[in-house]
């Protein structure tokens, strides 16, 4: 996140002696991204962060592909994904390509017996149902319905839920997740026309420091496999850090919509971006106010991108028979648009209360076996009259 952040105690300069009260050194770690060119954080540890005692299990979590080359539109009933106790086991990859995984999860329990580190991907975790606390090596973030949690790759975390009925929409991105460049100046500051600003970004608080030795299980994801690593010290042993690479939260309810006299294109709803996809937030807003406006979107040939919409709440103006938790996939190569009657119904309406998250990928998405378990195979015919 291009906002400088500091928690805990740090020395006045980088890479100099920083000693404990007994005279021993704290252990400095540079956590960089994109080699030495991306955002980074310097942290200071009670113990060496390199002490691996054992490498135990190694197992694949790669998705099983059902349709590697797809041109069919799909509707997935996301709430039909069964709830499971374990956070990682509950994650079901429904759509994927070489740049990202799109995941549904319904974990019932907090992560108590292990820590997790995804070295493959930045994670965008959207909280559809549930609340709790994301506990990380860089401090804690409270979360609730409507929050996006952005966890850069390699950050060790646990997730604690206050509830058992939890529904998450997750995107794992092999490229870093940033705020949209059209909303930033050359310093990285969000501009006046941005639909959100730095005040809306929640940064970690409550830096918990544990100077403990023992056996600590960290599940590390690398190349779509999980490695069970036993570390000799508690990973949350940071006494202080500063930098730009840390997890943060942003509520979809703080996204300020951009409207116009006629229908505005999806880029005005953009919230995050990578080199491989964009994320948009559709939120309650006033409709278009031209006297002859048609608030429903026009038909669109997304010839260069697959469109994924995750429906959160409200009535989505352009679709029929869509419920909370549904996902629609409109693949590149064929046009999509409002369902029959949707455009006519929208005329004269003053506002919409819809809430949805859109992911547009620049490479085609493959459909997994997990997706077919919850799919409506006739959805592509729902535009027939």
Positions of predicted regions on the chain:
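Jelly-roll (double-stranded beta-helix
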Residues: 1-385
């Amino acid at each position: 996140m291009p906002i400088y952040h500091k928690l805990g105690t740090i020395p006045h300069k980088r890479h100099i002696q920083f000693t404990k009260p007994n005279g021993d050194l704290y252990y400095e770690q540079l956590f960089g991204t994109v080699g030495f060119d991306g955002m980074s954080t310097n942290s200071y540890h009670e113990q060496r962060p390199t002490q691996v005692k054992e490498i135990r299990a190694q197992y694949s979590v790669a998705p099983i592909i059902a349709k590697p080359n797809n041109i069919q539109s799909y509707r997935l009933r996301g709430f039909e994904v069964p709830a499971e106790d374990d956070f990682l086991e509950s994650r079901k990859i429904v759509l994927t390509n070489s740049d990202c995984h799109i995941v549904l999860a319904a974990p019932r329990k907090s992560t108590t017996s292990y820590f997790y580190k995804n070295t493959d991907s930045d994670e965008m975790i959207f909280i559809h149902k549930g609340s709790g606390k994301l506990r990380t090596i860089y401090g804690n973030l409270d979360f609730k319905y409507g929050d996006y949690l952005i966890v850069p790759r390699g950050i060790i975390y646990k997730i604690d839920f206050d509830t058992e009925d939890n529904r998450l929409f997750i995107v794992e991105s092999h490229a870093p997740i940033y705020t949209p460049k059209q909303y930033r100046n050359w310093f990285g500051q969000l501009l006046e026309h941005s639909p959100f600003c730095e005040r809306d970004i929640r940064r970690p608080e409550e830096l918990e420091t544990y100077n403990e030795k023992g056996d600590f299980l960290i599940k590390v994801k690398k190349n779509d496999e999980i490695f069970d690593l036993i570390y000799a010290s508690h990973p949350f042993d940071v006494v202080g850090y500063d930098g730009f690479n840390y997890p943060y939260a942003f509520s979809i309810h703080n996204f300020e919509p951009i409207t116009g006299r006629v229908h505005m294109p999806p880029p005005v709803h953009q919230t995050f971006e990578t080199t491989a996809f964009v994320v948009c937030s559709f939120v309650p807003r006033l409709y278009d106010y031209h006297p002859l406006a048609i608030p429903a979107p026009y038909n669109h040939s997304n010839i260069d991108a697959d469109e994924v919409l995750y429906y959160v709440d409200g009535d989505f103006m352009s679709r029929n028979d869509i419920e909370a938790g549904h996902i629609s996939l409109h693949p590149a190569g064929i046009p999509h648009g409002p369902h029959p009657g949707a455009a006519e119904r929208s005329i004269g309406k003053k506002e919409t209360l819809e809430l949805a998250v859109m992911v547009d990928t620049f490479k085609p998405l493959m459909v997994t076996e997990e997706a077919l378990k919850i799919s409506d195979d006739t959805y592509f015919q729902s535009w027939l009259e």
